[in-house]
Amino acid sequence: MSRLSKEEISERLLELIKDETKPAIGCTEPVAVAFTVATGKKYMAGEVLKIDLKVSKNILKNGKSVTIPNTEVCGLDIAGALGEICGDPEEGLFVFRNVNNEYLDKAKEMIKNKVVTLNPIENTDPVFVEATLKGEQDEVIAILKGGHTNIEKVIVNGKIAFEKDNKNKKDNKDCDFIKELSLKDIRQITEDISIEKLDFIMDGIEMNKEAAKEGLKRQKGLTLGSSLLKLQEEGKIGKDSATIARILTAAGSDLRMGGGMCPIMTSGGSGNQGLCVILPINVVAEDIKAPKERLQRAVFFGHAVNNFVKKYTGKLSAICGCAIAAGIGATAGIAWLLGGKDKEIEGAILNMLANLTGMVCDGAKGSCAIKLSTSASEAVISAYLALNDIIVPNNTGIIGNTVEDTINNLGMLCKDGFYKADDVMLSIACKEVI
């Protein structure tokens, strides 16, 4: 990184955050399946008679139990069928935008007639979908890898029709530059970057606030947000910023996991992570009446820290990235928003890691709202504790000598220690499929 100027590093970080912070409708794992099928169909000359889906186990775990937008059904096979029927690859993460009851009935008929098959595969990228579409004359294979709309290759009748040019496109290795930064570096970029470049941050804040508002009104998912709000109105839980963050984040997740059509701004490629980064920071900003510019920078910082952590833990992994990586991003943003310096920001992160490390991912589903709500609340509390000089000591348990050491420890635990645990969880959560 020494060969790059501060301005170049700042621009690369901004580019990374923009690339990983985009609106989406629905959980991004079913989206990835529908998008892959929709892309493959674009290369078909005639009717699709058969769809064979192969997905990574992580895609399977995180996509099998979430409700497809504008439906009351779950399943990656249904997602694939809808991708063929009404999916438009030009819509990207909005591929489910056109779903309605008529299309859903057609998709159910495809499943009933065994038009769609689904099988998990091992030893591949965590984000991987291969869709083989067969017609009377054509056979198209579309392969998605590394990102929820990242089509790597399309093969038509045995010949490559499209192959991504990785020479002119940043790959995972290029994006790993963020691991060479320190938290202090990221904080400095956050403070120095031109505010005009952060307009997209406000779009995400407004989008996710609206999703939380809709989640409180509609009976979607677990209805945790509205249930917590009722408890608050009855005086059984408080009205402090930590509780408000818990309620709103839960409500947004209720909507997303329950098939709501409201777009949600993602973080690190995940809508739930977008909710968990943005909403707690915004709640605290409203509570302390922070200026708009400071809120924008705090949320940008939160997105950056979330992506920083995920470069160690992986895009999809054995731990709950929504609660841990996004929660760490949120608490960092809150600590900075409150005026914390590097000591307090890093202390807030350490408090979160000492608290929530070990929360496993058992797949995306309605109950994710519980984990998100816990993380949102703890992100607020951890930041306030750090600003009151309550910080877990170094070199205790998962906590290393520095915050960067600790995040590296988290990555080691996730990739080396939890690898078998993830296989066991997959066998439990997906036993009817595997």
Curated annotation (Swiss-Prot):
One of its GO terms (molecular function) is L-cysteine desulfhydrase activity. It holds the Pfam family SDH_alpha. GO terms for biological process: L-cysteine catabolic process to pyruvate. InterPro entries: Ser_deHydtase-like_asu, UPF0597. Belongs to the UPF0597 family. This is UPF0597 protein CBO2008/CLC_1955. It comes from Clostridium botulinum (strain Hall / ATCC 3502 / NCTC 13319 / Type A). The lineage of its organism: Bacteria, Bacillati, Bacillota, Clostridia, Eubacteriales.
